[in-house]
Amino acid sequence: MMVPTTGTRGEICCAIADRIPAQESLAQAAAGFLGQSRIEMGYRRFTLDCSGLALGVYATQGIDLYSGLGKLDGGNGVGRIFTHVVQHGRIHYGPTVHPGDLVFFHNTWDFNRDGFPNDPLTHVGVVEKVEVDGTVVFVSWVSAGIERYRMNLQEPDQHKTGDGRVLNDFMRRKWPGDPQATRYLTGQLFAAFGTLISR
């Protein structure tokens, strides 16, 4: 399922929405996984990847992000989670973002292995907070482990400010031979936010 990648580029985004305890709990759960080498909730262990982290975070609130989906609904794990949000929550592009929101990305790696950046819904993270300049801080898993990442949709093409503050982390690895149109920063690869808990 394809969603726009440019809907908020350069617009006034993002601000944190009014805090709701259940959403705060999701954000705190995501932060609690930082640096962990396993994603576990009770007796359940999740795969050590971005989808597994999202599943584990939401499991802390009794939410199964694969609930109601057939085995192939949505394709990969990220696509399945996106489909769940479409069915049970709200896909949006800001300008307000909730703690615990899911944040989806396109083209973070060559999923279909054809050498082109044409891979929808390849990564997901969980929003922890929004900084005063609108930079979204989210928790996700990449090859280095479970870490915090930043994304600024007002400056999607800028990695750092002049004083060294990170606005957009690198989310796609650079490879020799990448097509000229390949993008690498979080703000460039942003697909959408997803809200499941609204009260």
Language-model features: where?
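Functionally constrained cores in energy, signaling, and assembly domains
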Residues: 58-61, 128, 148, 177-178
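N-terminal capping segments
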Residues: 1-73, 86, 181-199
